Each structure stands twice: as structure tokens, then as C-alpha cells.
Amino acid sequence: MAAVSVIPNGDEFHLEGGAIAVLMVHGFTGSPASIRPWAEALHREGFTVRAPRLPGHAQTWEEMNKTRWSDWYAEVDRNFSELKKKYQRVFVAGFSMGGALSIRLASIRGQEIEGLMLVNPSIHDPRASMKLVPLLQHVIPSLGGRGTDVAAPNPPKHSYGRTPLRALRSLQKLWKVVQRDLYLVDVPLMVGYSVNDHVVDPKNSEMVIDNVSSIDIREVIFERSFHNVALDYDLDLLVEESVSFIKDVLSGAVNRDERDLIDAEFDAIVSGLSLDESAPTTYLDELDEIEAAEEYRGDNKPLPTLSSTQRAALVGVIGGPLYAVSVQFLKFDPLGLGAWPGAIALFAGIVTFFWQMRPDNDDDDGVAL
């Protein structure tokens, strides 16, 4: 039996409904609590909903550091198999990293999935600081988290306030696998993204839309919410679009493969109609053409990539040894103090990192990817 969640309402849940089931997957360092409002709304529409808690999540960052992406995916796959045995048709929905895991499932078991719903899917992060994770994971086990990226005030706690670096490194490996296999995804697809997401760049969604093989892709834009839409102002829009997508797939209004498209083209020709075969233009493309647009900023300020303390520590850890090497081998000693300044900077940087590892503040909340 899995350990009890330390996050309020963070345990997995199963809401019994009708013969149509939806498997819902939460994000990195998050918990089922982060998607519960979305899940409960789908249940009220008559669907059976299950949201597992991924291994290592909603406990402590130390426990999560013991898990890898293969553990998280295995839990998703296991729950999907259980739903397939009991329910007629099964949809999959993923938020953030849960989107990456859902894409992975669709690339392997796509023929068994009725449709895929993604909200701010996380499949890459080009920030320079992420390139340091492979090194930092061997030096420090975790970094302090950032505030929850929700525009609405007083969001519920749904994750812990630290980022476990070994788990984050494993997430980076998952991203590579998912990017490689995007072309294998051909299920009906709904992709929703926030234009003001401070955690996952909207270009992640653009990458998904541009590289999957799905014939029918429904694009949903959240303009009033930040990263976690299910806890934010656009929850109603998310639910409305999700229900509409599921019903359209069930009714056959959404095409799954090329045969359906060929049939639709034939019917259109017979009816004297024409189908637009031009490449779809996404909302992100349209944003590039807008010269001036007022963005909804919400109540939260944009979140920094690293705090000033973390940046100073990185300078010490990286710059200290470089200074010492320049003194020792290049005879470059601008301060005239030998290698000592470099050694002191390195020591101070390491001490600062360990200070960042102090116990969590239970009132703090980390950003769930």
C-alpha cells in the first residue's frame, strides 16, 4: 500500500460513473489535488474518473528523489490497463508532466485510447539553468521551489515546496523520449495551454501540435489563467471544452485516422463542398502577428527562474574553481591573494546550497510541472 499523502486531498481517487472512463494524470512534484476540480466536474457529467498518485509524489522530496520516470509511467500504464478491463471506452487526460506521461502512453497504446486531452503539457525546457541539472544532481539533492503559478488568489496546497534534482534529471530524460516519439501519436487530441504560463512555455504545446500525427486536433487557449488551469479562473472553460471533446469523439464527429479523413473528403466532394487542406494555423502563430495586445497578468507576478541567492551560489560553485585554476596555471592573480578567493567562493556556494536544503515550510507550495 502506498504511503499516505502529506498534501491535503493529495491521495489518488476513483469517482465511479458511467461506462466511459477518463484517466487523469497530475504533474511533477504535484498530486491528484492539482486536477481534482477538473476531475469532479467530469464526474458530474456522468464519466468515471480515476486520478492515480504517481510514485514518490505528495510525500517528501526525499522520497521522490528515489523514483524515476519509468516508475511514474508504470503507474499510469497500470491504471489504464485496469480501466480498459472494466469500461467500454477510456480517455486519457494529462496536466504538465502528466501530459508527457499521457503522450508516452498514447505513443505505445494509442489504438486503445479513445482520445487524449493535454493541459500545458511539459515536454522540454530550454532555459539555461536546466542545463546545469545533470551536474547539480550530484552535488545537491534539491532546490527550493517557487510559488504556485495560479492567477486566482489563495490556491489550495497541492505540492511540496522543493524540487528534487535527481527526479528532475529523470524528467529531462522522459522529455527526450516523448519528443522522439511524438509522430507515433495519432489519437484524437485536445491541447489546452495558457498564454501566461510561467512554468511551462506555451511553445511546448506548439511542439506537440506540430509533430503528432493526429488528424483532428482541438486547440484551447486559456487567457485568464497561469500554469495550473484546474485551480484557476479558466476551470469552467477547461471543463466545457473537455466535455465537448469527449462527446464529439464518442459521436464520431472527430476523425481518428486517414480512412476517416478520406471518407469525409469523399462525402464533401459528393455534396459539392470543399475541405480546407492548408496547414492549420495555431493561436501561437496568430500572437506573432498581433502588434499590441493586453495580457491578463492576474494577481501573481512572473516567477523568477532562480532566486538571487541561488544565482549567487551558482556563481560561487562555478566561478570559484575557475578563478583558482586561472591563478594556479595561468598565473592570473588580479587580487594578489593567490587561489584563496576562489576557494572561499566555492565553499560559500556549497554552504549556500546546503542552506537551501533546510526543512520545508509547510505553508509554502512548490510549482508542479
Model-derived features: positions:
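Active-site nucleophile loop of the alpha/beta-hydrolase fold
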Residues: 117-128
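Catalytic histidine neighborhood in serine/cysteine hydrolases
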Residues: 50, 206-228
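Catalytic active-site module of serine/aspartate enzymes centered on a nucleophile-bearing elbow/loop
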Residues: 224-258
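Intrinsic, low-complexity terminal and presequence regions
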Residues: 250-369
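Short, surface-exposed "cap/lid" segments of acyl-processing enzymes
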Residues: 3-60
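Gly/Ala-rich beta-loop-alpha elbow adjacent to hydrolase catalytic centers
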Residues: 94-98, 102
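Short beta-strand/loop motif that positions the catalytic acidic residue
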Residues: 184-185, 191-193, 197
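Short alpha-helix in the alpha/beta-hydrolase fold that links the catalytic acid
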Residues: 38, 187, 201-210, 221
